[in-house]
């Protein structure tokens, strides 16, 4: 079982129940899913860039990504409907906890000049988003194997009703918020 999942079930869940004043343990917010997305604008010119991004994302998450396609044509970006423009992975269950554990304890501390993640990136419904400027912070990726430094968006969806509940949950799980 994932270390972070054990920590959640053993320590975080009971403490949050007492702290928030819930009557039932099932009311305590939990992680629902983690979506990792890489938007690759240059995929239209060079399909090899997209293949590398898919490979990198698979190494980082342990799951094969889905190639995302443009929903509509945009002439200014020279993109036609149906063209591949990125890739994403939706993680749930044990893989989600493994990835989040690795993100919090390994990847984020390796970010240059890291002072914590913004506490303002909640969406109003208990979900949190953060962006990484480069994929090199993950230990699975070797510097020599990377053809192009690529950023990624990470969305953490929770069952929390409010941003405050979600923030308390993520803080208890070890998310390093700044300020």
Curated annotation (Swiss-Prot):
Single GO cellular component term: ribonucleoprotein complex
Gene Ontology biological process terms from the UniProt entry: translation
UniProt GO molecular function: rRNA binding; structural constituent of ribosome; tRNA binding
InterPro entries: Ribosomal_uL5, Ribosomal_uL5_bac-type, Ribosomal_uL5_C, Ribosomal_uL5_CS, Ribosomal_uL5_dom_sf, Ribosomal_uL5_N
Subunit comment: Part of the 50S ribosomal subunit; part of the 5S rRNA/L5/L18/L25 subcomplex. Contacts the 5S rRNA and the P site tRNA. Forms a bridge to the 30S subunit in the 70S ribosome.
Family: Belongs to the universal ribosomal protein uL5 family.
UniProt name for this protein: Large ribosomal subunit protein uL5
Originating organism: Natranaerobius thermophilus (strain ATCC BAA-1301 / DSM 18059 / JW/NM-WN-LF)
């Amino acid at each position: 079982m994932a270390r972070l999942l054990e920590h959640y079930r053993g320590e975080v869940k009971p403490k949050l129940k007492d702290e928030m004043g819930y009557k039932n343990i099932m009311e305590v917010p939990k992680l629902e899913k983690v979506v990792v997305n890489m938007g690759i604008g240059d995929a239209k010119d060079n399909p090899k860039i997209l293949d590398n991004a898919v490979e990198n994302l698979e190494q980082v998450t342990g799951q094969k990504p889905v190639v995302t396609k443009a929903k509509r044509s945009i002439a200014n970006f020279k993109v036609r409907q149906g063209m591949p423009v990125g890739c994403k992975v939706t993680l749930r269950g044990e893989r989600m906890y493994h990835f989040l554990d690795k993100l919090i304890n390994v990847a984020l501390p390796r970010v240059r000049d890291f002072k914590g993640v913004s506490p303002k990136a909640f969406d109003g419904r208990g979900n949190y988003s953060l962006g990484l400027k480069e994929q090199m912070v993950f230990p699975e990726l070797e510097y020599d194997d990377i053809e192009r430094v690529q950023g990624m968006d990470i969305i953490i969806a929770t069952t929390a009703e409010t941003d405050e509940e979600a923030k308390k949950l993520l803080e208890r799980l070890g998310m390093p918020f700044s300020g």
